[in-house]
Amino acid sequence: MENRKMERRQFIAATAAVLAAPALVAPAVAQPAKTATLRFVPQANLTLLDPILTTALVTSFHAHYVFDVLYSTAADGVPKPQMASGAEVSADGRNWKIHLRDGLKFHDGVPVLARDCAASIARWAKREPFGQLLDKVVDSYGSADDRTIEIKLKKPFPLLLSALGKPDSSIPFMMPERLAQTDPAKQVTEMNGSGPYKFVTAEYNSGSRVVYVKNEAYVPRSEPPDWGTGAKIANYPRIEWHIIPDPATAAAALQNGEIDWWEQPIPDLLPVLAKDRNITLAIDNPQGRLSVIRFNTLQAPFDDVRLRRAVRLGVKQDDYMRATFGDDLTLWRTCFSMFPCGTPYETDEPDAMPGDYEAARKALKDAGYVGQKVVIINPTDFPAIHPQGLVTADMLKKIGMNVDFQEIDWGTLVQRRANREPVDKGGWSIFHTFGSAVGWSNPAVNGVIRGQGAAGWYGWWESAKAEQLAQDWLDAPDPARQKAIATELSRYAMEELPFVSVGQWFGKTAYRNTITGVMPGMAPYPWNVRPA
């Protein structure tokens, strides 16, 4: 850890010098007060475009531009109509009708029909954990007429609108029926949505640039914007995503007016940016995000729960958070819970993660570990994740594991993590990721705590008990019973360990004062942002 602290100090000093230097020779390049293009730097490169195929947040953010949703969640946590004008449910709770509002068209000019939405819901429900719970009780996804989606159920599903309005990744975005009929394990072939921006295929260059242009035919709602709900007004004719993996380069571009908005600056650079009167810093997601070690429970060595428990014993959350987010305690906290802290189902089990290397070594020995290779895949171009892989590799070596640390770019990682083969055939043992507190707040939406096996999220933890508890939570008659079930699931997962929490953090976004209207929420929403 001391070496990492020295590297951090050297990095801060060197970067500060680089960022300060231009100001000594020339003033920052001023961006015009009114501009036709918003220039944005996302958290990572965009390699997969289909928001149903992948849970990568950057893909979900991209999808907010191109596609739209029937329902979305506001800051109060309540799902509200978006493409829908409203919904009705039969007295027995088994027949839902969702009505489409006026003016909905896909980017090719074809009207959005109920059958497009029914097919989109059906595809999403095969892939996403909350949707899979819904899918088990669905008789049919269909349409009563061109403007009315009809979902017939085998039994009531009171949280249907919450499922359709989930706010994080794997959101049920609506697509034309012909695209929605694509195998959910394969990427759709075109980006034809009904959202406020159109994807410019000819200018897409993964690793460099993504371009969107305003959808002039989009009809916004009349309500004020609130997270993913309300009026999605596209104030810029053109938005460019600039992929800049080097933080110092991104910071300099922001200071010099070469970009307008940097989604996720690294904490080391926040003090430098805070001194620039032309830049605003703001918390982007008030509930925060939970960072985790994700195990491949399908293959050795972490198919053995005893080895996963040994790793948990060695985890020191402070090491992870300080390595990634520095010493500013307003940016992170420890969180000894399998559900994010600050959410209704938070538990506090610090004894489960004592950071005790001796105990971890003993646990490995008792489990009969004999040097099986542990492959960690770690993204070099994702600052909110990369340092955590270094901490884990260091810790595993210290407790006696045979570590093969493989650094790759994020785009490669999100594809490689789908490999279920053993490590000697290109598989993996560990990667690191994070999820929003709201997006992982309950058993239905939290894909990393679910035990769906091959049908579940990367890592493929299989647990009939976890799945039954998720179903029991969904069927519970009241909030008190739901909390008891969620607590049982959390404690069970802490023992079985599909993942290990390494801390919760609160990122800041940075933008030039030449733009305004940037909203907090679950994504860097493009609507409402406008020239100042």
Name what the model sees in each region:
Residues 511-532:
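Long beta-strand-rich cores associated with HINT superfamily self-processing modules
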Residues 41-91, 122, 192:
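N-terminal lobe/hinge region of extracytoplasmic solute-binding protein
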Residues 220-272, 402:
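Ligand-site clamp/hinge motif
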Residues 298, 302-342, 387-388, 493-503:
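Periplasmic-binding protein-like
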Residues 399, 404-415, 443-513, 532:
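Extracytoplasmic/peripheral linker and loop segments enriched in polar/acidic and small residues
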Residues 133-180, 185-205:
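Surface-exposed binding/hinge segments that line
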Residues 197, 330-366, 380-387:
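Structural transition elements
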Residues 208, 246-247, 265, 343, ...:
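Ligand/substrate-recognition segments at binding pockets and active sites
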